[in-house]
């Protein structure tokens, strides 16, 4: 038998729809959220001139280097290029000893902090007549803003041996005959003795004019 009782109708949702709101208020909220995100983000610290120089030398010659650590070879180059090594108070040996002392036993590189410690060690030797703080500042001035010196550029070398082999005016014998006075090669004439069968004496100024004179006299 069918249920004669009518089921109660569901109550209509009387909650009014949310209004889109004020566009200006929404824009202000987004602006505040953006400012909060920017404040929360950590800004990249600005590098000092000393650390910039450290990174330039740290990546020199190594495409995989990050610039955060420096090998002994680049450490020695930095000390040489920046004139920390003066050959008197600080030598290459001093630089190597300090590097071995500062780096870890199982490490082959030094960090920027260790780099600063190494400079303090060398500063005592480099500027003996200054206080510790002044000596460190002087060493920093030698390095700040510097970059590796690129070597290996080919330069023209002037030596007696090279000049003797390249200056054609100094050639003797058969080699001299291969070039004219300007140094230009004569080609085949400079390599082979060509026989002049014209009948004229070599050096005769009027060579080749006999036929013209005979024909002109007729």
UniProtKB/Swiss-Prot annotation:
Cellular localisation: Golgi outpost; Cytoplasm, Cytoskeleton, Microtubule organizing center; Cytoplasm, Cytoskeleton; Nucleus
Q: Which residues bind Zn(2+)?
A: 60, 71, 79, 82
Which reactions does this protein catalyse?
A: GTP + H2O = GDP + phosphate + H(+)
GO cellular component terms, A-Z: cytoplasm; cytosol; microtubule; microtubule bundle; microtubule organizing center; mitochondrion; mitotic spindle; myelin sheath
One Gene Ontology term of the biological-process aspect is:
astral microtubule organization
Q: Which Gene3D superfamilies match?
A: EF-hand
Modified positions (Phosphoserine) in chain numbering? 19, 31, 34, 106, 158-159
What's one Pfam family the UniProt record gives for this protein?
Answer: p25-alpha
- Keyword set for this entry? Cell cycle, Cell division, Cytoplasm, Cytoskeleton, Glycoprotein, Golgi apparatus, Hydrolase, Magnesium, Metal-binding, Microtubule, Mitosis, Nucleus, Phosphoprotein, Zinc
| Gene Ontology MF term list | GTPase activity; magnesium ion binding; microtubule binding; protein homodimerization activity; tubulin binding
Q: Where is this region: Mediates interaction with LIMK1?
A: 1-115
Assigned EC number: 3.6.5.-
Q: Where is the composition biased (Basic and acidic residues)?
A: 174-183
Glyco sites are at 151
**Recorded superkingdom:** Eukaryota
Q: What does this protein do?
A: Regulator of microtubule dynamics that plays a key role in myelination by promoting elongation of the myelin sheath. Acts as a microtubule nucleation factor in oligodendrocytes: specifically localizes to the postsynaptic Golgi apparatus region, also named Golgi outpost, and promotes microtubule nucleation, an important step for elongation of the myelin sheath. Required for both uniform polarized growth of distal microtubules as well as directing the branching of proximal processes. Shows magnesium-dependent GTPase activity; the role of the GTPase activity is unclear.
In its UniProt entry, what is this protein called? Tubulin polymerization-promoting protein
């Amino acid at each position: 038998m069918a249920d004669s009782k009518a089921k109660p109708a569901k109550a209509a949702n009387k909650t009014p729809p949310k209004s889109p709101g004020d566009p200006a208020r929404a824009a202000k909220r987004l602006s505040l959220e953006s400012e909060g995100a920017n404040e929360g983000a950590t800004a990249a610290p600005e590098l000092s001139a000393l650390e910039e120089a450290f990174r330039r030398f740290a990546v020199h010659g190594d495409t995989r280097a990050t610039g955060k650590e420096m090998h002994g070879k680049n450490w020695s180059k930095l000390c040489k290029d920046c004139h920390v090594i003066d050959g008197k108070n600080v030598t290459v040996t001093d630089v190597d000893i300090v590097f071995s002392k500062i780096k870890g036993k199982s490490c082959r590189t030094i960090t920027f902090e260790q780099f600063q410690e190494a400079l303090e060690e060398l500063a005592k030797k480099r500027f003996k007549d200054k206080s510790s703080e002044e000596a460190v500042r002087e060493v920093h001035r030698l390095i700040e803003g510097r970059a590796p010196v690129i070597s290996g550029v080919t330069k023209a070398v002037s030596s007696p041996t090279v000049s003797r082999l390249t200056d054609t005016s100094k050639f003797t014998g058969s080699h001299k005959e291969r070039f004219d006075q300007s140094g230009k090669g004569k080609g085949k004439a400079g390599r082979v003795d060509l026989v002049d069968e014209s009948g004229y004496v070599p050096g005769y100024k009027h060579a080749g004019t006999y036929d013209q004179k005979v024909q002109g006299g007729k």
